[in-house]
Amino acid sequence: MKKSIAITDEIYQKVIEHIHVGMSEYEISALVQYYSIASGAQQMSFDTIVATGERTALPHGRPTSRKVKAHEPIMIDFGIQYQNYQSDMTRMCFIGEPDPKIKEIYDVVLKAQLAGLGAIKAGAKGKDVDKAARDVIEAAGYGEYFNHGLGHGLGIGEDGEGPTLNSKSETVLQEHMMMSCEPGVYVPGVGGVRIEDDVVIIDGVGVPLNKTTKDYII
């Protein structure tokens, strides 16, 4: 699993080195696919999500011919299957400084993700981990725009393994469980932000396995 995630980190770094103003979402998605297969992936974990500008308000926006502009958000959410282990990561990036409103949303989502990561531990319930992140977003006034659960299980197979992190999950987290932690805020007409890491519980606490930076200017 660690190898799958490490390769995912490497793929993202290669992709963002090529992103430029005027590049289409289709082209970015194609780069993700190319570097994934070239790096040894069996296949993608799911259809790659690439959205730019106001389209980032779509939580699962599939790529289009829309072209990248400076200062606007670029959302890339992808994962690979490597030796049957599935990875899943989301990062935001910008060419130049982001619009102040999107930067505000980014900072809220990052704070929420850190709260969620801190709540992942053996013995915690899935709903309590979700609440830790959701409380941050609600306190910032964006609660209505976080419209999915905090995370899902990861591992072997199409649906992965492990717990679901949402407001109704009674699952008790246990040692070695793998899960994603991916809060998001999606404001129609403005844009959206999601930040996602893959996490494993080791010695009772959640350990993020992704090494990709969350510094977003490329």
Predicted regions and their residues:
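Active-site neighborhoods and metal-handling regions in enzymes and metal-associated proteins
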Residues: 2-218
